[in-house]
């Protein structure tokens, strides 16, 4: 297993361990996912891929509007939760966004809510999305860019030299990935979203509940010690 496969396996485990608590903690996911809805195609006889479907919350909503919906996630625990709690007539697939288990030109549009920031290398994922999209197909997504969790990142920088927050792409870097004639960025919007927490402990607990506490470059893979949290 190479280092990238190991990282993806760890990400799958992180999100899998959060499957039971994900829906009650996913304030940002709900907000951003609903903000994507006005961008969706009006035509309803379409085949849709929910890439990184998680617990299937938005997969279920998509199924109410489109002919065929596929929910794909790297975490089998997330998928099992989705199968049990959400639409039974959705096609659920375990798969890696870097190697989608789908035929060429088989999908009308791909929906993805706060997923691709975990994908590395992202250009491979974009090529896969373009491969499975039909001619004229659309990729509608939300992601996080540089500046996300900057308060948490700057606070940890005063405690130790470890990486506690993932380095997100800049808006420019993201746009440059969509620069080919076959896969061009048609329209985008960058929006600041502010969530307030009682203290940093509550923020850390929510990130863990979401499975979003995996940082590939982190030296100390365990939880920060008591002294570190007191300094925070």
Task: Go through each PLM region and give its residues.
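A short SAM/SAH-binding and catalytic strip from SAM-dependent methyltransferases
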Residues: 109-121
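Class I SAM-dependent methyltransferase SAM/SAH-binding core
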Residues: 49-99
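A short glycine-rich, Lys/Arg-flanked "PGG" loop and its adjoining helix->strand segment in the class I
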Residues: 123-135
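N-terminal, positively charged/glycine-rich alpha-helical extensions of SAM-dependent methyltransferases
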Residues: 1-18
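A short acidic, Gly/Pro-enriched loop at the edge of an enzyme's catalytic core
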Residues: 98-109
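Conserved catalytic/acceptor-binding region of the Class I
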Residues: 138-202, 209-226
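Conserved alpha-helix/loop element of class I SAM-dependent methyltransferases that forms part
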Residues: 27-46
